[in-house]
């Protein structure tokens, strides 16, 4: 199934716009019809079992994290229509990091670097350590 703007996922999440694609699938901004809150929906596109288990593990790890500089997955669902799993996460409306860096003051940039390092240090302190694998410059 190809998702598009306006798609209603599980009679709850109204897709508003496509953000991008990653290792496991597509990411969309959606409105949660139950709360009227914008969320990010990460839909697992490939249907192989190994990839699905990794996607599920990503949710489990994210759900258990507790750090102010890390996003927390709120829900793992399976689309009733096409059986594709999806994650519901907070939507960050300020755009990508790369779109923000150019307008940051030097002091804000150093705070940002400190916050990223703090989040990564938290991940690396877990047992076993969690390696992010998708950090972009």
Where on the chain are the PLM-derived regions?
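Glycine-rich ATP phosphate-binding loop
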Residues: 28-29, 36-45
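Short beta-strand micro-motifs within the conserved protein kinase catalytic domain, predominantly
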Residues: 72-85
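Protein kinase glycine-rich loop
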Residues: 16-23, 27
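Conserved short submotifs of the Hanks-type protein kinase catalytic core
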Residues: 82-96
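Protein kinase catalytic-loop region centered on the HRD/HxD motif
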Residues: 118-130
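AlphaC helix of the eukaryotic protein kinase fold
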Residues: 45-64
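AlphaC helix of the protein kinase catalytic domain
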Residues: 96-105
């Amino acid at each position: 199934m190809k998702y598009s703007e306006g798609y209603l996922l599980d009679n709850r999440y109204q897709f508003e716009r496509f953000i991008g694609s990653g290792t496991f699938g597509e990411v969309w901004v959606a409105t949660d019809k139950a709360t009227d809150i914008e969320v990010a929906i990460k839909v697992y596109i490939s249907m192989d079992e190994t990839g699905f288990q990794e996607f599920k593990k990503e949710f489990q790890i994210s759900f258990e994290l507790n750090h102010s500089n890390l996003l927390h997955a709120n829900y793992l669902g399976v689309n009733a229509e096409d059986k594709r799993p999806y994650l519901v996460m907070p939507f960050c409306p300020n755009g990508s990091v790369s779109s923000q860096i150019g307008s940051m003051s030097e002091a804000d940039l150093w705070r940002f670097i400190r916050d990223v390092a703090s989040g990564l240090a938290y991940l690396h302190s877990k047992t076993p350590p969690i390696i992010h694998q998708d950090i972009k410059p």
